Amino acid sequence: MKSIGIAELIAGLELGAPLAPELASRLARGVHFDSRRIEPGWIFFAFAGANVDGRNFALQAIEAGAIAIVSELAPLPGLESNWIQVKHARKALALVSRSLFENPTHGPLALFGVTGTNGKTTTVYLLASILEAAGFETGLFGTIGYRIGKQILASVNTTPESVELYEHFSHLMAETSRRPAVAMEVSSHALSLGRVWGMHFAVAIWTNLTRDHLDFHGGMESYFEAKCELFRGQDAAAPDVAAINFDDEHGRRVPIAASTRLWSFAMRESSPPSTVRAINIQTGFAGVGFDLVTPQGTFQIHSPLLGEFNVSNILAAATAALGYGIPIEAVREGIEKCPSVPGRFERVDVGQPFLIVVDYSHTDDAIRNVIRAARALNPTRVITVFG
């Protein structure tokens, strides 16, 4: 991180109250929303959460050396000269972090974002495998964990807070001379809350949309609009490439910016014409195989992943990679080398004379797809344990 004066750092933010004059000339060296992470010269962001008011930790942050407190709420008594009130704290954190970390997603870092109800995790793992096959130093962020180069971390949120992402991006770029790339799940919560505000995505991928998170969004149309934010660009240029699932009726409605190159994909004969298509699909206990029809020609693909629904995930990753310009040889290699994703129609083998799979089916549509995929393997019986 570089040091920047507060006046310069907040120049583009929507303030909720005038800035205290004594704050303007202070030099910021870092930023965080966790008061336990604050160091001298840093800014503390006090989020107003559903259960916890971040202002309760403002004094702790000041004692740790914070030079300013940022909040959407009014200052606590006695802290007026340290307070910066903003209209949207998470968007402000994202923009301040972007400046302090010198804007990596607008420069050397290639950022691939995957949104949708189902298939995000598997698509991200496939993308990471393809990027590695193409020679990138790769980071991965998703529901079941984060990976920065060779370092593996437990995940707290599907999409981390903005400053955490920038910290991880910085570590990834520091440990290699190869070009860095990140494949990450981008949840509707993250898009609505502003966690990726100001980040430029080289490629944005749409998997599908089914009923989920309606308690947060209030309805399917609001849920759809939240997902579409990834393709509009939030205080950043729209994605260079959009990889859209044309098998999904909602995907065909996603707004694409004039500057974005559309690469669509499909596997159903009834779907509209698409840039990339899967034909001659075969599924079995060894995985899936199909012919990948692309603008560069038709290529045979095989993956150890089980279930026809994974063909759509493979298509999403392959289309995103091809749209970005990754050679088909690296795409095929990455798909073939990508192992079973933990908890995603994952094979469990302890020597039993039958197939067991475990799947994180968190929606009714996902459960239907899993049972359909199991039946397509032509077993004598399918036993489902759900809980």
Language model segments and positions:
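Acidic, Mg2+-coordinating active-site environments of NTP-dependent enzymes
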Residues: 76-80, 175-178, 192, 201-356, ...
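Residue-level signal for inorganic ion chemistry
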Residues: 42, 61, 96, 114, ...
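Conserved nucleotide-sensing/catalytic segment adjacent to the nucleotide-binding pocket
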Residues: 157-187
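N-terminal leader/targeting and accessory segments in enzymes
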Residues: 1-95, 99, 277-279, 300, ...
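ATP-dependent carboxylate-amine ligase
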Residues: 1-27, 37-43, 53-56, 91, ...
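Switch II (G3) loop of P-loop NTPases
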Residues: 180-189, 356-362
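Flexible beta-alpha connector loops of hexameric P-loop NTPases
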Residues: 151-162, 212-219
